[in-house]
A protein has these predicted regions:
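Short beta-strand and beta-hairpin "edge-sheet" elements
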Residues: 19, 61-89, 165, 281-311
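Glycine- and charge-enriched low-complexity intrinsically disordered segments
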Residues: 106, 313-317
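Assembly/oligomerization scaffold segments
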Residues: 1-96, 184-196
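Acidic, small/polar-enriched beta strand-loop surface segments
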Residues: 2-7, 154, 163-300, 304, ...
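Charged- and aromatic-enriched interaction segments used to assemble
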Residues: 81-191, 195-197
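Flexible glycine-/small-residue-rich
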Residues: 41, 89-91, 177-179, 212, ...
C-alpha cells in the first residue's frame, strides 16, 4: 500500500488515481502564494484514458497515510507521446493570484477589516489571527487580488514588526503569525539528508546617514549606527522632502530590515507530510541549532522533503 494517495473528483465522486502515479511533489513554495502539486502519471489506467477523469479545473486531493495534505484543482495538463501525463495543480489561492480588481479603503481601517472586505468580495472564507495595524488610505487599481492582500500585510508587518503567514486550510484562507504554536517536528541528524547554510553580506546596511539640502550643499543631519563589527556599509536617507521624524523612522527600519547578513537555510530530511509554510520546526545539525520558521517546503512520494527556513525570533508565535 502506497503512503500517498491521489484522488480526482467527478462531482462528489472520488476517483482513485494512485496506481497511475509515477512521480509526485506537493507543498508551499517560497514566493508562491498558492500551494502547488506536480504529478507525473501513466496516460492510461485500468484500460481507460486518464483524460476521461483528469480535466482542467477538476478538484484533486493528495493524502498521506490517509490524511489530506493537498487540496486544489488541475491547472495545467500535458499529454506526452500518448504515454505519460504531467499535471500541475494549485489550491484555491491561484484564483486570487490570477484575478485583477480595484479597491479603495479610507484611512483608519485596521488590517483585519481590509482583508475581510477583500475576501468577502471574492467569496473567500477568512480565518484571521494576525496582529496588524491601523492603515492610512489604501488604493489598489487593477491589481491582482493576491497582490492587494500581500501589500496590505506587508504594510502591517512594516509597522508592527510581526512576521505574517498566509495559506489555505480546508477551504479557508488563514492569515496568522509566522511560526506560531509549538514546533511541528524535530529535525535531528538522524532525519537529516543534507543542508546548506549560507550567510551573505550583499545588501547589508550597518550605518544610515540622514541628509538634507536638495538645492544647496548636502548636510548630514544625523547618523544611525547598527552592528558595525562587519565594517561600515552606509545607506543614505534624504530628508529634504520629508520630516526629520519620518527620516529617522526610515533609517531605523533600514537597520532592522537590512542590518544583519542575509541568511539562507535549506534542509532536506525525512518527511513530515503535514508540514506547511508558516509552521515552526526544531533543527539540530551542524551549524543549525534551535527553532526555525518554514518559508517554503516541498514533499515527495519517496517521503522526503525540502525546506527553506528562517530563524524563529522572539515575538513570533
Amino acid at each position: 500500500m502506497s503512503a500517498c494517495s491521489v484522488f480526482v473528483y467527478d462531482g462528489d465522486t472520488p476517483l482513485d488515481l494512485t496506481k497511475a502515479v509515477i512521480g509526485l511533489e506537493w507543498g508551499d513554495m517560497k514566493g508562491e502564494l498558492a500551494a502547488r502539486a506536480v504529478l507525473r502519471m501513466n496516460a492510461r489506467m485500468g484500460g481507460a484514458e486518464l483524460a476521461e477523469y483528469a480535466r482542467l479545473n477538476a478538484p484533486i486531493s493528495i493524502l498521506a497515510y490517509g490524511r489530506e495534505v493537498f487540496s486544489g484543482v488541475i491547472w495545467d495538463y500535458s499529454l506526452i507521446d500518448g504515454r505519460t501525463v504531467n499535471m500541475v495543480c494549485y489550491d484555491r489561492l491561484i484564483f486570487l493570484s490570477g484575478s485583477a480588481d480595484s479597491a479603495y479603503f479610507p484611512a483608519g481601517l485596521n488590517t483585519r477589516r481590509v482583508l475581510e472586505s477583500i475576501c468577502r468580495r471574492w467569496d473567500m472564507p477568512l480565518k484571521y489571527d494576525y496582529t496588524g495595524c491601523t492603515h492610512g488610505r489604501l488604493s489598489y487599481r487593477a491589481q491582482s487580488v493576491a497582490s492587494q492582500i500581500i501589500s496590505t500585510l506587508d504594510a502591517a508587518q512594516a509597522v508592527c514588526g510581526d512576521k505574517y503567514m498566509l495559506r489555505m486550510e480546508g477551504g479557508t484562507l488563514h492569515v496568522g503569525l509566522r511560526g506560531a504554536g509549538k514546533p511541528v517536528c524535530d529535525v535531528s541528524r538522524a532525519r537529516l539528508i543534507s543542508y546548506t547554510h549560507r550567510r551573505d553580506m550583499s545588501g547589508l546596511v550597518t550605518r544610515v546617514a540622514i541628509t538634507t539640502g536638495s538645492s544647496g550643499p548636502v548636510r548630514v543631519r544625523e547618523v544611525f549606527d547598527g552592528d558595525t563589527s562587519l565594517g561600515i556599509l552606509q545607506e543614505v536617507v534624504d530628508a529634504s522632502g520629508a520630516t526629520l521624524s519620518d527620516a529617522r523612522t526610515q533609517a531605523r527600519r533600514l537597520l532592522i530590515e537590512r542590518g544583519t547578513p542575509v541568511e539562507t537555510i535549506e534542509v532536506a530530511c525525512q518527511d513530515e507530510p503535514t508540514l506547511r509554510r508558516g509552521d515552526r520546526v526544531t533543527v539540530s545539525a551542524g551549524s543549525l541549532a534551535g527553532e526555525y520558521d518554514v518559508l517554503g517546503v516541498m514533499h515527495d512520494r519517496l517521503l522526503s522533503m525540502q525546506m527553506e527556513l528562517a530563524r524563529h525570533t522572539d515575538g513570533e508565535g
